[in-house]
């Protein structure tokens, strides 16, 4: 059975999440096209019609990034498939960001990935979306207006896009990793490091995934030329799979994590420990967003069964 609150959540909604340690924000679309925020501050709250931060085309992809929770950016598409930005800065609240004014039109089936660049106090942003020629395009904000960045090449039409960013302690600048799916259904990585720029190689992390499956990624414990990454995607068995990159081991340990509805979107956040939080739809109350957690103390387990407004 559903609940009145769960019925407000769009089935197969885009999902995005940001955090500052265990202070959490989750974004989703309601059945009227509005983007809402649910939050966790020692307990779950909000997600109601009073917590709308933007309006987007129905079925929009969602991406979000934050610097702690002082600056939050949430990305979606307008009815005309133009990239738009809902922005939050502590002290000024939510407002419409400058992105829509740049009029970057993307494919109607594009997904979105976004990151604040790590290791700097400046507000520098990178967004990844799919153009109508099916290439993955980077869009950059360095404080002086939105511009097109590097084009990462052709991908499967409608591919999921995962992205994460950190700064190695021995590197002068941020590192970026972007994951997407190619026409042959491989899940691949493009990489950027400050001393090399974008590497030309595509690194395959999974040989064959369902077409247009959701992809999400996070990282933790950046050190001296070392990083730990977790990449998630929805596999053909209708479960979320996890692919691990661990320092000294590279890509290894690919395993199923938790069941979802067919076509679920996913979002992942993490903090030191590590602690992992994954958000998805698994059929609870039909369309509620559910949570999976991992921590050293308790290992892998389901967290909140249904985020507000579902219960």
From Swiss-Prot:
Sequence repeats lie at residues 1-53, 54-103, 104-151, 152-209, 210-256, 257-311. Beta-L-fucose 5 binds at residues 230, 242. AOL adopts the six-bladed beta-propeller fold and contains 6 binding sites per monomer, each located between two adjacent blades. The 6 binding sites that are non-equivalent, and owing to minor differences in amino-acid composition they exhibit a marked difference in specific ligand recognition. This is Fucose-specific lectin. GO terms for molecular function: fucose binding. Beta-L-fucose 4 binds at residues 177, 189. Lectins have particular value as specific probes for investigating the distribution, structure and biological function of carbohydrate chains on the cell surface of animal, plant, and microorganism because of their specificity for defined carbohydrate structures. FleA is suitable for detecting core fucose on cell surface glycoproteins and/or a useful vehicle for delivery of substances to the inside of cells. Lectin that specifically binds to L-fucose and weakly reacts with mannose and N-acetyl-neuraminic acid. Has strongest preference for the alpha-1,6-fucosylated chain (core fucose) on glycoproteins among alpha-1,2-, alpha-1,3-, alpha-1,4-, and alpha-1,6-fucosylated chains. Binds to fucose residues of IgE in mice and human, causing antigen-independent IgE-mediated mast cell activation and anaphylactoid reactions in mice and is possibly implicated in allergic response to Aspergillus oryzae in humans. Homodimer. Beta-L-fucose 1 binds at residues 25, 37, 94. Keywords: Lectin, Repeat. Belongs to the fungal fucose-specific lectin family. Residues 1-311 are annotated as: 6 X approximate tandem repeats. It comes from Aspergillus oryzae (strain ATCC 42149 / RIB 40). One of its GO terms (cellular component) is early endosome. Beta-L-fucose 3 binds at residues 126, 138, 198. InterPro entries: Fungal_lectin (IPR012475). Beta-L-fucose 2 binds at residues 73, 85, 146. Beta-L-fucose 6 binds at residues 44, 277, 291. The lineage of its organism: Eukaryota, Fungi, Dikarya, Ascomycota, Pezizomycotina.
């Amino acid at each position: 059975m559903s609940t009145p609150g769960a019925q407000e959540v769009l089935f197969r909604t885009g999902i995005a999440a940001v955090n500052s340690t265990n202070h959490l924000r989750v974004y989703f679309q309601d059945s009227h096209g509005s983007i809402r925020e649910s939050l966790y501050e020692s307990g779950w709250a909000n997600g109601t019609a009073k917590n709308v931060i933007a309006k987007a085309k129905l079925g929009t992809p969602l991406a979000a990034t934050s610097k702690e929770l002082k600056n939050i950016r949430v990305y979606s598409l307008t009815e005309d498939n133009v990239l738009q930005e809902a922005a939050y800065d502590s002290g000024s609240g939510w407002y419409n960001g400058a992105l829509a004014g740049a009029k970057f039109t993307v494919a109607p089936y594009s997904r979105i990935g976004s990151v604040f660049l790590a290791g700097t106090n400046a507000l520098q942003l990178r967004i990844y979306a799919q153009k109508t020629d099916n290439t993955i395009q980077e869009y950059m904000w360095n404080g002086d207006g939105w511009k097109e960045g590097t084009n990462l090449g052709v991908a499967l039409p409608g591919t999921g896009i995962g992205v994460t960013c950190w700064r190695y302690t021995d590197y002068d600048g941020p590192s970026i990793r972007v994951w997407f799916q190619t026409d042959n259904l491989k899940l691949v990585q493009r990489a950027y490091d400050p001393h090399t720029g974008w590497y030309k190689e595509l690194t395959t992390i999974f040989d064959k995934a369902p077409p247009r499956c959701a992809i999400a990624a996070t990282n933790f414990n950046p050190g001296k030329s070392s990083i730990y990454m977790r990449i998630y995607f929805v596999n053909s068995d209708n479960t979320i799979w996890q692919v691990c990159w661990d320092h000294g081991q590279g890509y290894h340990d690919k395993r199923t994590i938790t069941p979802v509805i067919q076509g679920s979107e996913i979002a992942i956040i993490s903090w030191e420990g590590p602690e992992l939080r994954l958000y998805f739809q698994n059929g609870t109350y039909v369309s509620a967003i559910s949570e999976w957690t991992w921590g050293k103390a308790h290992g892998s387990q389901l967290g909140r069964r249904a985020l507000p407004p579902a219960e």
